[in-house]
């Protein structure tokens, strides 16, 4: 194919897409960890004799025990040991002991921005939280009167809330406790009446609060401290010293109260203070300025304004580094307590730092964070895009923030300040909608954790693109007039239009070019990476674009990937930044290439090795495989792609296939979004994917002796063991079906398991028969495939095994899955459906030149869903690309080149395609984009011309093989005795309340009765029914369902005398079913009962 044609000209270069992860972790190693260690120095014992100092700047990390691949293979954590220099100072003798102490293991980030924890790749998701600082809000009381309040929110510590009331009095609350007169608080802090009144711009309003305090008899600092103690610690005897200590520890102790760098920055900015950055606790000045601002709000003077808590200027992002820093602080807090106890207990003279520092609390805190925090997630590795999006995800859930249930509409909604920072499209459907978002393409997180987006400066109507773009946070952007990225400019960068739409203070207005301050970098900077891969995005409805971006993440990597004919130009960078494609770091020559490694020799003659992944299993069971695209002797330059990864072709991301598509109904097979496909997709393996399943078995130490992995399995035919080696483990390359043995294992049987005749034989002959039972690992139902890898772990090899296990064997089975009926497919515009039928090639509709159509979609799927982008992509651009033998790159939002630009561009290319000899049928001026198709079955043309083209269609990970399931007899729930639910439990299909109504509506009494009894939880009845079916006898009448008995027992346990009686008044014993079957006569069957018997009943 010829090279790609770039249609719309705009900045398509994006910044490094994983920088948000890597940059944050780098900050943690260089600054965050040192900050934490030094904030805990010195730790002093209770007598003040001993001091322990951590020299944070001198910490060091040891080389990790395993590299990344080895850690994955051994189920280990890719981590490094942390050592820090500690100094123990004895104040009495002046002696100083210095020692390097081990303080724990720190998981390290891989180059791709992930962590390997116990062999699994995990991602730490960015969390978006309310920024610490001061917030002013208004509330309406019951009478509709507006009152104002100010909240001082620290990074950690107690909240302080000032509020006004209807009597113009000021109150304060500490951590949502009872109200306290604001002036009591001021006096307790140590401010006199005049101190306060001098600082306020409207002291007359505050005087009422002073009078109220005087009336209560609180006129001095001591009285104020007593009052404060009473309110905060009711029920305890108040004292002045207690009040002082309480106040200090709540607001002025750096260990208990911390505004953080961000909180101090926000506070200074909002209240126009000049307090230095290093002061992280509250100061009297903070409190006074807050009061002053609140009074100005109440009186509506001085330019005071309320805060919008959903504005991105008031929300910040916590990335890996900061989350990890908080976790280290938790660990160090626990460690500090232990150190103080050990200082008190130990002999002062002989103590060393190593004896004091116990690494366990820190290790536990870090382990807990990576292993079980809500923000540490198992990486979505379905394809490279899923991986990349996961690392750029922003979550409002997690510890210390919202829960799904509490989040209202305001938090979830799109806010004007999201523009260019958080994608307005990509968010999950369902309960998490709006709480989980994705970083926009050009956005970055600044040092304070606020999201910034880049702009070009505009001076007198000329866009200056000479230097680097200017990054602005949401706060700064509010004060500027910002034009969109698609404004038309001439060659000198002068804006050509007379009036430009701009955003200013969260609103839209139109201004002349000389009033514009900034211009956006690119039209794509508003949306996320996944959304930016959708061509003609601007012609899609937002709901469908959302589904389109989410479904691209679920596309399965195919056996033969193909890049899209119509792309947006960002495909290359997505593939590179996902880490799926190996890239050379140096200029040089390729000196060696095979399927497993590429060696590049640089200009200095140094060899650089690039190992390729071959058929490895991803977290989602898809296949990770890399194929070289360079040849021996090629010259390469730094940054060049050396090999294709899974779902990549030519260094671009390639999630699906370009298929020939027609929009037309076909015999009802594409009713309700169903998809009709041609047999060609199966035959030519267009949508065949490789899936690798992992099976694991442990040989454990039991009470009766060790389990053994062996080939000697009791009661198994020799042919079933054909593919096992002498140890009883399947050989690599064997093809296995469901039920085949993968690893033979026998477990010792207990004495009680022996039948009496065997005990007799053993008593007579003293013959110790091999009393073991078969406990082998077998291929589960519905699974099959080829064994691609076997891994054996034993303690002798130095592997870490679970407690009680002597050996662990893992078998990897790969299967090729062709596309089949029931699989889910989708386009990039949210047009999804299930395959309803695979039609032979000769029956498919075909083009005038005889080419059969690949996929037939329903035209009714377009108008109501308003995702017209698919028509532009398929029928127009894709069709032109196919006929011109080229690929197009179209950046979304092209109206800057003129109105109706998409249609013009597309029609121009279609006309060009029709000029080729013998292809005049490609473009019909009467019906542009439509073609007269011919029915493959009859050879007759269809009545109407049909929209035909090439569209990019993906196969999604929701495969029918993983979902189809049937049950005959299986496990039952312990209490209700009903079948379990779900495929994993081999469960049954639930017949719910509404299904019962449906059967009742038709009067299907017998069907309903057996569904609720014999087929569900009538224990005796189901055994008898099975017996009757096996022996070919009539099925007996059903008995009482077990769940009814459970209900009876539950009511009886509440003390209700409830029982079942016959017409004669005799109580029926429902528990008689439990008695052995031998003593009770079998139940009558329907056939054995005469009419007379029914009357008796």
UniProtKB/Swiss-Prot annotation:
S-S bridge residues: none
Gene3D superfamilies found in the cross-reference section? 2.40.50.100, 2.40.50.150, 3.90.1100.10, DNA-directed RNA polymerase, beta subunit, external 1 domain (2.30.150.10), DNA-directed RNA polymerase, subunit 2, domain 6 (2.40.270.10), RNA polymerase alpha subunit dimerisation domain (3.90.1800.10), RNA polymerase Rpb2, domain 2 (3.90.1110.10)
GO MF:
DNA binding; DNA-directed RNA polymerase activity; ribonucleoside binding
A GO cellular component term found in this entry reads: DNA-directed RNA polymerase complex
The EC category is: transferase
Q: Which reaction does it catalyse?
A: RNA(n) + a ribonucleoside 5'-triphosphate = RNA(n+1) + diphosphate
Spell out the residue ranges making up region: Disordered: 1073-1097
- Report the SUPFAM superfamilies cross-referenced here: beta and beta-prime subunits of DNA dependent RNA-polymerase
Listed EC numbers: 2.7.7.6
Q: Name one Pfam family in it.
A: RNA_pol_Rpb2_3
Q: Which PROSITE patterns match?
A: RNA_POL_BETA (PS01166)
> Keywords in UniProt for this one?
DNA-directed RNA polymerase, Nucleotidyltransferase, Transcription, Transferase
Organism superkingdom = Bacteria
- Record GO biological process: DNA-templated transcription
Instruction: Indicate the segments annotated as coiled coil, or none if absent.
Output: none
| Its job | DNA-dependent RNA polymerase catalyzes the transcription of DNA into RNA using the four ribonucleoside triphosphates as substrates.
Instruction: State how it assembles.
Output: In cyanobacteria the RNAP catalytic core is composed of 2 alpha, 1 beta, 1 beta', 1 gamma and 1 omega subunit. When a sigma factor is associated with the core the holoenzyme is formed, which can initiate transcription.
Concerning its family, UniProt says: Belongs to the RNA polymerase beta chain family.
This chain's protein is named: DNA-directed RNA polymerase subunit beta
- Give the organism the record lists: Synechococcus sp. (strain RCC307)
């Amino acid at each position: 194919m010829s090279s790609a044609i770039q249609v719309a000209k705009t900045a398509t270069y994006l910044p490094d897409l994983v920088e948000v992860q890597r940059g944050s972790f780098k900050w943690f190693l260089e600054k965050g960890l040192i900050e934490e260690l030094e904030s805990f120095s010195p730790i002093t014992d209770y007598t003040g004799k001993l001091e322990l100092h951590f020299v944070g700047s001198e910490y060091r990390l040891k080389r990790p025990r395993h590299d990344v691949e080895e850690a994955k293979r051994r189920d280990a954590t890719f981590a490094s040991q942390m050592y820090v220099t500690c100094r123990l100072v004895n104040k009495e003798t002046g002696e100083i002991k210095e020692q390097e102490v081990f303080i724990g293991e720190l998981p390290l980030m891989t180059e791709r921005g992930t962590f390997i924890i116990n062999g699994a790749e995990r991602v730490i998701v960015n969390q978006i939280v309310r920024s610490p600082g001061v917030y002013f809000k208004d509330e309406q009381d019951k009478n509709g009167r507006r009152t104002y309040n100010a909240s001082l929110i620290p990074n950690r510590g107690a909240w302080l809330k000032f509020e006004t009331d209807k009597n113009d009095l000021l109150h304060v609350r500490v951590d949502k406790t009872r109200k306290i007169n604001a002036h009591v608080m001021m006096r307790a802090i140590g401010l006199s009446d005049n101190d306060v009144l001098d600082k306020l711009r409207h002291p007359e309003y505050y005087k009422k609060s002073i009078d109220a305090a005087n009336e209560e008899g609180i006129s001095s600092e001591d009285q104020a401290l007593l009052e404060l103690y009473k309110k905060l610690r009711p029920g305890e005897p108040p004292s002045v010293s207690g009040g002082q200590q309480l106040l200090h520890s709540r607001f002025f102790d750096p260990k208990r109260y911390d505004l953080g760098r961000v909180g101090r920055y926000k506070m200074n900015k909002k209240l126009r203070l000049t307090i230095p950055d290093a002061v992280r606790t509250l100061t009297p000045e903070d409190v006074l300025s807050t009061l002053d601002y609140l009074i100005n709000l109440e009186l509506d003077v001085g330019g005071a304004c309320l805060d919008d808590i959903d504005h991105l200027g008031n929300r910040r992002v916590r990335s890996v580094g900061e989350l990890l820093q908080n976790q280290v602080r938790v660990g160090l807090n626990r460690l500090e307590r232990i150190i103080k106890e050990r200082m008190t207990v130990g002999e002062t003279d002989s103590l060393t730092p190593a004896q004091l520092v116990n690494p366990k609390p820190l290790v536990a805190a870090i382990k807990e964070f990576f292993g079980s925090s809500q923000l540490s997630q198992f990486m979505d590795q379905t394809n490279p895009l899923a991986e990349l999006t996961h690392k750029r995800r922003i979550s409002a859930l997690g510890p210390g923030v919202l829960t799904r249930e509490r989040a209202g509409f305001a938090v979830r909604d799109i806010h004007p300040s999201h523009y260019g920072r958080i994608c307005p499209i990509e968010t999950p459907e369902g309960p998490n909608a709006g709480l989980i978002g994705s970083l926009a393409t050009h956005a970055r997180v600044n040092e304070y954790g606020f999201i910034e987006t880049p702009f070009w400066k505009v001076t007198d109507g000329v866009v200056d693109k000479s230097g680097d773009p200017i990054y602005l946070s949401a706060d700064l952007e509010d004060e500027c007039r910002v034009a969109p990225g698609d404004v038309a400019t001439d060659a000198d960068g002068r804006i050509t239009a007379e009036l430009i739409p701009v955003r200013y203070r969260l609103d839209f207005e139109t201004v002349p070019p000389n009033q514009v301050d900034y211009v956006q970098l690119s039209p794509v900077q508003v949306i996320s990476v996944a959304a930016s891969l959708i061509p003609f995005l601007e012609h899609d409805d937002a709901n469908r674009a959302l589904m389109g971006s989410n479904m691209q993440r679920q596309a399965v990597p195919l056996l033969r990937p193909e890049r899209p004919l119509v792309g947006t130009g960002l495909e290359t960078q997505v593939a590179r930044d996902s880490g799926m494609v190996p890239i050379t770091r140096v200029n040089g020559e390729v000196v060696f290439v095979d399927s497993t490694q590429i060696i590049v020799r640089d200009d200095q003659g140094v060899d650089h090795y690039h190992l390729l992944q071959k058929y490895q299993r991803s977290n989602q069971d898809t296949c990770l495989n890399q194929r070289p695209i360079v040849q021996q002797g090629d010259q390469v330059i730094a940054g060049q792609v050396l090999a294709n990864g899974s779902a990549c072709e030519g260094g671009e991301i390639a999630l699906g296939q370009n298929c020939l598509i027609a929009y037309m109904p076909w015999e009802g097979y594409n009713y309700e979004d169903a998809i009709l496909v041609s047999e060609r997709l199966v035959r030519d393996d267009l949508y065949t994917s490789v899936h690798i399943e992992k099976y694991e078995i442990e040989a454990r130490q039991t009470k009766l002796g060790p389990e053994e992995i062996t080939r000697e399995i009791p009661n198994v035919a020799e042919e079933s063991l054909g593919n096992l080696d002498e140890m009883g483990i399947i050989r690599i390359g064997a093809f296995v079906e469901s039920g085949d043995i993968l690893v033979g294992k026998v477990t010792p049987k207990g004495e009680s398991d022996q039948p009496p005749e065997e005990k007799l034989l053993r008593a007579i002959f003293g013959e110790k028969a091999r009393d073991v039972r078969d406990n082998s690992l077998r291929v589960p139902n519905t699974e099959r495939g080829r064994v691609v890898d076997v891994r054996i772990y034993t303690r002798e090899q130095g592997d870490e095994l679970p407690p009680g296990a002597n050996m662990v064997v893992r078998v990897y089975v790969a299967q090729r899955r062709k596309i089949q009926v029931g699989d889910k497919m989708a386009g990039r515009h949210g047009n999804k459906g299930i395959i309803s039928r695979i039609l032979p090639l000769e029956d498919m509709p075909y083009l005038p030149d005889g080419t059969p159509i690949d996929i037939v979609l329903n035209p009714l799927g377009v108008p109501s869903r308003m995702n017209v982008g698919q028509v532009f992509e398929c029928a127009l651009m894709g069709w032109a690309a196919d006929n011109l033998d080229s690929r197009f790159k179209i950046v979304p939002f092209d109206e800057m080149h003129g109105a109706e630009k998409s249609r013009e561009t597309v029609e121009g290319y279609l006309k060009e395609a029709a000029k080729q000899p013998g292809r005049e049928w490609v473009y019909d001026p009467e019906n542009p984009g439509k073609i007269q198709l011919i029915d493959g079955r009859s050879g007759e043309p269809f009545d109407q011309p049909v929209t035909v083209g090439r569209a990019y269609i993906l196969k999604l990970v929701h495969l029918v093989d993983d979902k189809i399931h049937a049950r005959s007899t299986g496990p039952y729930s312990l209490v209700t005795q009903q079948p379990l639910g779900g495929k994993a439990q081999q469960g049954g299909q639930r017949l719910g309340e509404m299904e019962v109504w449906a059967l009742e509506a038709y009067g299907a009494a017998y069907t309903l009765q057996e569904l609720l009894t014999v087929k569900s939880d009538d224990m005796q009845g189901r055994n008898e029914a099975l017996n009757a079916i096996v022996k070919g006898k009539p099925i007996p009448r059903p008995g009482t369902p077990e769940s009814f008995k459970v209900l009876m027992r539950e009511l009886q346990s509440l003390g209700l005398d409830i029982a079942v009686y016959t017409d004669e008044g005799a109580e029926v014993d429902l528990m008689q079913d439990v008695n052995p079957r031998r003593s009770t006569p079998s139940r009558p069957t329907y056939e054995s009962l005469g009419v007379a018997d029914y009357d008796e009943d």
